[in-house]
């Protein structure tokens, strides 16, 4: 009684598992069908280790539209993804990865691992400047500003005045923007 090879893994899929060939040849003493079944049973409890928790690959910058990161090391045949997997605004988000089936992390668990990912602030290239002039007329007046977009910047300081003179306004990037030098404070 001889058995041919038995493939106990892989199956041609892309799960990253390793196939093991088991065969039985009754010409060797001490090997029985029970021994082969024990080997098969041992293989059925094998776990496959995921070597690294996925991480954000590349960077995202605020666009005003929904974005999702590309993940280095993510394979849907080995794990599920959950948590926050897409966002619109600049900031930090948290996704989770959980092994499925026979897959485990290097610590031997199938616990969900949290991974932070980010959308960076978009850049405001120029500080606004007053365009034209304002002449005293007895009423409160506000200047016009070049390069000012209220969705990108808030305006502070003296925004309007009645009397002749020099005044200072300040501009601060909103939460999705930064100055071209990387700062977010008023200028």
Language-model segments: which ranges?
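Short, low-complexity N-terminal tether/leader segments at secretion or assembly junctions of large
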Residues: 1-45
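Solvent-exposed beta-strand/loop surfaces, strongest in extracytoplasmic domains of secreted
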Residues: 46-187
């Amino acid at each position: 009684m001889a058995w041919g090879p038995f493939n106990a893994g892989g199956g041609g899929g892309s799960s990253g598992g390793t196939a093991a060939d088991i065969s039985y040849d009754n010409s060797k003493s001490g090997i029985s069908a029970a021994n082969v079944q024990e080997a098969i049973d041992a293989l059925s409890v094998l776990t496959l280790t995921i070597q690294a928790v996925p991480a954000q690959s590349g960077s995202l910058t605020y666009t005003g539209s929904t974005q999702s990161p590309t993940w280095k090391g993510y394979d849907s045949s080995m794990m599920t993804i959950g948590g926050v997997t897409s966002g619109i605004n600049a900031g930090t988000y948290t996704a989770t990865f959980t092994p499925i089936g026979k897959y485990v992390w290097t610590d031997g668990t199938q616990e969900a691992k949290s991974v932070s990912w980010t959308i960076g602030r978009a850049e405001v290239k120029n500080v606004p400047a007053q365009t034209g002039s304002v002449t005293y007329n007895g009423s409160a007046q506000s200047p016009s500003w070049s390069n000012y977009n209220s969705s990108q910047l808030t305006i502070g300081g003296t925004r309007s005045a009645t009397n002749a003179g020099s005044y200072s306004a300040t501009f601060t990037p909103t939460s999705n923007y930064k100055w071209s030098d990387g700062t977010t404070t008023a200028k």
